[in-house]
Structures are given as structure tokens and as C-alpha cells.
Amino acid sequence: MVSVEEIRKAQRAEGPATVMAIGTATPPNCVDQSTYPDYYFRITNSEHMTELKEKFKRMCDKSMIKKRYMYLNEEILKENPSVCAYMAPSLDARQDMVVVEVPKLGKEAATKAIKEWGQPKSKITHLIFCTTSGVDMPGADYQLTKLLGLRPSVKRYMMYQQGCFAGGTVLRLAKDLAENNKGARVLVVCSEITAVTFRGPTDTHLDSLVGQALFGDGAAAVIVGSDPLPVEKPLFQLVWTAQTILPDSEGAIDGHLREVGLTFHLLKDVPGLISKNIEKALVEAFQPLGISDYNSIFWIAHPGGPAILDQVEAKLGLKPEKMEATRHVLSEYGNMSSACVLFILDQMRKKSIENGLGTTGEGLDWGVLFGFGPGLTVETVVLRSVTL
């Protein structure tokens, strides 16, 4: 007779979860940030709001974003005028778009990750799908399973409406799945399309306008598994994870799904709240490893906006190059919500290889990945790089 203990031992992986492959995708429509204010005020029939347009121009100039990718192009917006208004009932039109497009963009990223992984997709045992864009049943996880031709028995997890911290959440969940299920290979997909949040300008809610200056579309996918086979090539180990709600941060970042789409609200002091509490999160994560110099680790931080990165750097005395990969992704893609940190992970390993830096983490062994979002919720992931 086999004991429960023996069964449990046999079910668990030996080693830590590893990221084995990364893929990213964006819609084809690329938007230049320098000309975006003119386009945005024209397409939303708001050109009479000249002062607000100047304010929006300044927001775009300060955003440190060069370009973004958006599914919503001029043609689609002209066909859907309700999406261009500030507060017109438009949820049906938005839902009709994202329910189809979110899994499609996710498929593009997933296909690239599976190709890099190099194993048959029939070996994928679990799927985690995450999006803040739209809600449906059966969900985007089901649609992606069908689009990719995954096994019907794949174990699916659908995460809707999490927000910008969720790139950390999916890695935390994937780590637990991979380490507690021997032989598990988890496909993680974050796919975000701003068709739910796009709306015309108003001078009564400037936080909505901040979102219009920052958000972009993108999807990223990773394969996570423990005990890699010789044919699999791990990129990063997922060593430790945590999630916490910051003190005194209620209402700092909110999103509400309404007839008018997903509305976005934020308090001015989001950068202050994050920078004030970041050291506590780092001590909890790195003290057990004997690390207290945060310039000695590599950094992947969700680029909610330039002010967050600036204040975190200042608070911790980080060298400018620490946030290089993070700022590069912000500059080239904007804030893609949950997908951002996975784009940064991809950027970091690519640059590390290009520059011959010795490890996937800019030549360093240990690193941190931070997700920040509604709550104010912070996800922390401790990463260990792999020798190149």
C-alpha cells in the first residue's frame, strides 16, 4: 500500500521553477507619441478644447514614450463613434472587439514562446491567461486553447481585471503550479488591448487623460517548468514570490467596468506610495539571501510611468543603468499593463546575450521583478539568472 506522503513526494518537482522561453506580440498599428495629441483630439472631435490639448501634449512629452501599438486605428474608431466620446454607453462595441482580439494577440505571443521552447505543444499541461481587457464566458483561456490546438485536458486559469501588477501574479502562480506538479509545463499569456479604456478627453478627470497618454497594446507569453530536460534551455529561475497591499493606499489606482467601458482613476501620489514602501519589499525578499546592495541585482519593474521609476531610483540610490531594460520597454511600447514585465524580461535576456554579459540578467546572478497596480498591490518576484 502506497502512503499519501509517498504520493505527494512523487507529485512534486525536484528543483525550482524556471522560465524556459519568452514570446511577445503587438498589433500592427504603430502610433508615434509626438503626433498622438493631434490625432487623439481630432479623432475624438475635441479640437475645440485647445487648453486641454496643450496639457495632453505636455503629458505625452513627459511620458518618456516614443511610440505605442494600438489595435484601435482611425478606421475602427470612425466606425465606432461611441468609443471616442468621453462617457457614451459603448461597452458592447468594446466587448465585441476585445473578446476576439485579446486571444488572437495572445496566440501570436504564445506561438513564438512555444517555438523558442522547442517542445510539442501537447506537452503543455497548464495555461494561465491574464487580461484586463474585457470579460467573457468561456474565457480567453478557452479561446486560446482552441486557437493553439492545445489538449482539451489542459488545466486552465483565467485571470480577468487584475490590472498592471498581474505580470508578477502570473509568474507567482506558474511557479506554484510547476513546482507542485512534476513534469508540468505552464504556458503563461498576458494579452492587453486598450479598446476597453480608450475614450475622449475631459477636463474634469485628468487621471483618465494620463491613461490615454500612457497605455499601449501588447501580449507576452512565457513557458514555465521545473527540472528542465537537456533539450530545454532555462532563462531565469523563479526563486521566491510575494504579494502585498501597500498601507494607506486605498483608492490609489482603481478601474471600474461600466456601460462606458473600463474607467481608470488614480491618485497623484502613486509614485510616492510605491517609492515609500519599496525598500520594505526588497528587505523581505533579499535579506535571507544576504543582499542589501540593490545596485548588485538586475531590475525588472512595471513601468507604470516615468515618475514611478524616477522616484524608486532616487529612494534606493539606483544607478541609471539599473532601469535601462524597463525604460526601453516603456519608450518603445508604452504601459501595456500586465504584459510589460514579461516584455522587459525578454529585452533583458536579449541585450545580455547581445552584449556578451555572462548571464541572462545583465551579467548578475540575482534580480527582482516588481508589478504595481490597483489596490495598491505590489507583486515581488526574486529571479536568478542563468549563465550564458
Curated annotation (Swiss-Prot):
Per the Swiss-Prot or TrEMBL record, the active site comprises: 164
Keyword set for this entry? Answer: Acyltransferase, Flavonoid biosynthesis, Transferase
Q: Which GO terms describe its biological process?
A: flavonoid biosynthetic process; polyketide biosynthetic process
The reactions it catalyses are: (E)-4-coumaroyl-CoA + 3 malonyl-CoA + 3 H(+) = 2',4,4',6'-tetrahydroxychalcone + 3 CO2 + 4 CoA
Repressor as a keyword of this entry, yes or no, is no
- The lineage's top-level taxon is Eukaryota
Q: What is its EC number?
A: 2.3.1.74
To which pathway does this protein belong? Secondary metabolite biosynthesis; flavonoid biosynthesis
A molecular-function term among this protein's GO annotations: naringenin-chalcone synthase activity
**Span of the signal peptide:** none
Function, as annotated, reads:
The primary product of this enzyme is 4,2',4',6'-tetrahydroxychalcone (also termed naringenin-chalcone or chalcone) which can under specific conditions spontaneously isomerize into naringenin.
* Protein family per UniProt: Belongs to the thiolase-like superfamily. Chalcone/stilbene synthases family.
Q: Which PANTHER family match?
A: CHALCONE SYNTHASE 3, HYDROXYMETHYLGLUTARYL-COA SYNTHASE
Q: What is this protein called?
A: Chalcone synthase 1
Q: Which organism is this protein's natural source?
A: Glycine max
Name of the coding gene? CHS1
